[in-house]
UniProtKB/Swiss-Prot annotation:
Metabolic or biological pathway, per its Swiss-Prot or TrEMBL entry: Amino-acid biosynthesis; L-phenylalanine biosynthesis; phenylpyruvate from prephenate: step 1/1
Name by which UniProt lists this protein: Prephenate dehydratase
GO MF entry, a single one: prephenate dehydratase activity
Domain ACT: 204-281
GO biological process: L-phenylalanine biosynthetic process
PROSITE patterns linked to this entry: ACT, PREPHENATE_DEHYDR_2, PREPHENATE_DEHYDR_3
Record-annotated Prephenate dehydratase domain positions: 3-190
Keywords in alphabetical order: Amino-acid biosynthesis, Aromatic amino acid biosynthesis, Lyase, Phenylalanine biosynthesis
Enzyme nomenclature, EC number: 4.2.1.51
Catalytic activity reported: prephenate + H(+) = 3-phenylpyruvate + CO2 + H2O
Length: 310
């Protein structure tokens, strides 16, 4: 069975996303392994990706973007640094928190354990319902449940899965300040053959550009002239020199789509470095698909054959 690394302990949203990926058959591998995996729990998202690079895991399930705070920067930075990795699948998870307490607790809540990101996403609920409680930081959403179970906090901002695993009572469910909060998770492994194109795919690259005027515009032109829909552009410092950046690009389409393949070849010629992060199916169309070039290819072949393009 595949070994899959993810942020632990048991009960995190990442584990919930991974369980759905496995149940939906999104993990590459032999048919006899379908539905099973060996968990490799780590103490951070970069740690999960390091487990893949070091051979301690076959894949890692990590968050890459959420609707409240945007891109998960530790994931981006870890994908861009170190030996190459590749994304094979993605899944979007609805995120709502569960306020947990120890069984039978009916006294005052003086302390609430919360992962800082979670605390920020439920701060209005906490102010309205537990305004006198002190928020104490937890290592993860699941760790908040463990803090409650082990008596380090009266209540915790956690997940339903963690409440079940730790045997805790639910004080409040589906807690979130912003409706429709969602997080996108990706399955990452070592470089290999991408999943087949489906017509609803995403391709991602990291670009390092020549430090000269117009370099970014020139790179973007390779997509625009081919009618490729860019769905995300983000810059991050290279961490090598002040004022130098690398650029993360997502586009609709697959490396097997001719326009995307041509754009990647052009970027390889133009850029200092192009790191391919993969082409993989999305749950729904991520932007307009790239145009088909079948008619144009037939026309060109006719010219080469001397038919005058007729």
């Amino acid at each position: 069975m595949p070994r899959i690394a993810y942020l632990g302990p048991e009960g995190t949203f990442t584990e919930a996303a991974l369980l759905q990926m496995v149940a939906k058959g999104m993990v590459p591998g032999p048919a006899e392994d379908a539905g099973g995996f060996t968990p490799v729990r780590t103490d951070s998202t970069p740690g999960a990706l390091s487990a893949v690079r070091e051979g301690r895991a076959d894949y890692a399930c990590v968050p890459i973007e959420n609707s409240i705070d945007g891109t998960v920067l530790p994931t981006l930075d870890s994908l861009a640094a170190g030996s190459p990795l590749q994304i094979y699948a993605e899944l979007t998870l609805d995120v709502a928190f569960t306020i947990v307490v120890r069984p039978g607790h009916d006294g005052p809540v003086r302390t609430v354990a919360a992962f800082p990101v979670a605390a920020a996403q439920v701060r209005h609920w906490l102010a309205a319902n537990l305004r006198d409680a002190e928020v104490v930081p937890a290592h993860s959403n699941a760790a908040a449940a463990h803090d409650v179970a082990e008596g380090r906090a009266d209540a915790g901002v956690s997940t339903r899965l963690a409440a079940e695993r730790c045997g805790l009572d639910i004080m409040a469910a589906d807690v979130v300040d912003e409706p429709n909060a969602r997080t996108r998770f990706v399955l990452v492994g070592l470089p290999g053959t991408p999943p087949p194109a489906t017509g609803a795919d995403r391709t991602a690259v990291v670009l390092r550009l020549v430090n000269e005027p117009g370099a970014l515009v020139s790179a973007m032109t390779e997509f625009s002239i081919r009618d490729i829909d860019l769905t995300r552009i983000e810059s991050r410092p290279t961490r090598t020199e002040l004022g130098t950046y690398m650029f993360f690009l997502d586009c609709a389409g697959h490396i097997d789509d001719d326009p995307v393949a041509e754009a990647l070849k052009a970027l390889h010629r133009r850029c200092v470095d192009v790191r391919y992060l993969g082409s993989w199916p999305t749950e729904s169309a991520a932007g307009a698909p790239p145009p088909r070039l079948d008619e144009a290819t037939t026309w060109l072949e006719g010219l080469r054959a001397g038919s005058g393009g007729a």
